[in-house]
Amino acid sequence: PVTIVNDVNPIIMNNIKGNIEFDNVMFGYDSVDLENGKVENNILKNFSLKIENGKMIALVGPSGVGKTTLVQLIPRFYDVVSGSIRIDGVDIKKYELKSLRKNIGYVQQDVFIFGGTIKENILYGKPGATDEEVIGAAKKSDIHDFIMTLDEGYETIVGERGVTLSGGQKQRISIARIFLKDPRILILDEATSALDNITEAYIQKSLEKVIVGRTVVVVAHRLSTIQRADEIIVMSRDGIVQRGKHEELLAVEGHYSNLYNAQKEGFIR
């Protein structure tokens, strides 16, 4: 496991705007522990990108080009080999780790559900929140009505890894956590890719509510989910190969239109 440590005198992250900047970032899993800055098998090479606060940016491209890796660097699940990532102009390594992660919400395909109650699982987003706050978050993520059909309601034990819940219900709990946590930066990493199309459509409605007013970075496999993004970043092994809005990218022949048309044909078949 990779050990991430605080700076000597870390800055507590407070009242951030949510501007994110990747500056010449180099990263490779094989090179994380190498000494003397020696770099091998890098997934990200001299990667630079600015994300304005309050904007929704989508990362698309084939598997293995570093989309998930890139977003995992923001909360410092890993540290860059070289270059820097800045939030509001400050290198994220200078922020106190706990406060950095407190300001970042992360929704992924494989939702972490532990074997406690539904209420405890929602509280994971903000330990110590009131019952009213928990219920409010559940209503916003459209899972309150389902919870109220259960005999024990919010005190229902969900079983290890949420074995009693469907994929859609688990995802709604993870979205309720975000409403409760209320982070300035939100990462959606293939959040709906494990769901069927009908469930995905419902979850998208919950996600549309939770993204309002935040800086949002989306990793998307299904391109149908990111058409409203302020900017779509198309990645390949060589870095960024295209960028723009959905309509702009569809209008030209290139990586994005090829990906989009291939998926569209796949869905129609």
List where the protein language model places each region.
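HAMP signal relay module
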Residues: 2-3
